[in-house]
Structures are given as structure tokens and as C-alpha cells.
Amino acid sequence: PQAVPPVQVDNDRVVVTEWRFAPGAQTGHHRHGYDYVVVPMTTGALRLETPDGEVVSQLVAGQAYYRGGGVEHNVINAHEGECVFVEIEIKPVAPPPAAGKP
């Protein structure tokens, strides 16, 4: 099954997505274009399929972590219950206009 990713906020600074994974659900292979922070809402194991192989990551509810842009993976819920986390993608800040220019 496919994980469910409703976007809660999408503006010029961030994209905030709540990811919900039934047991065995996955994101599909993707590459992160932005730096991001993940805040797990549940505790459990995720299996990550990366270009370098598979890794199992243990999420702990409330323990946030940061990753840089460019990460490539497929994320799979590897435990028996639902897995939920909030992902905050951080968009680059546009430089202010030069002095005297509109």
C-alpha cells in the first residue's frame, strides 16, 4: 500500500506534510529537494531502501531529526502498527533586493 501524505502547509518558506503509513505502506522512491526535519508522532521501525542498500531506522515519538537535501530513498513501515510523522521541508530564503533596486 501507499503511504498517505496530506500537505498541511505549503508557502514560500516551508512544506509541512503529515505522513501516515499503514503496516507495510511505503512512500515510493523519491529524492528530497530541500533540507528537512522529521518529527515522529509514533514509535516504531521504518525500513529505508537507499541507493547504498537497506537500513532499518527506529523512530521514537517526539524525537525530531534533520536531514540535508538530496537524500534518496523509499520509506516503508516495518512494524505492525500505523506509523505517523510530520515532515517539515525547509525552502531556501530568497536574498533581499539590492539597495536602491525595486
Kindly give the residue locations of the regions a language model identified.
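Short N-terminal segments immediately surrounding and downstream of signal-peptide cleavage
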Residues: 1-13, 99
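Extracytoplasmic/periplasm-facing segments of secreted or lipoprotein envelope proteins
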Residues: 9-26
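N-terminal post-signal-peptidase region of extra-cytosolic proteins
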Residues: 22-25, 52, 71
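Short beta-strand His + acidic residue motifs that chelate non-heme Fe in jelly-roll/DSBH
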Residues: 27-29, 47-48, 72-79
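Short, conserved beta-strand element in jelly-roll/cupin
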Residues: 31-47
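Short acidic-glycine-tyrosine-enriched beta hairpin
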Residues: 53-70
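Ligand-binding loop in jelly-roll beta-barrel domains
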Residues: 70-93
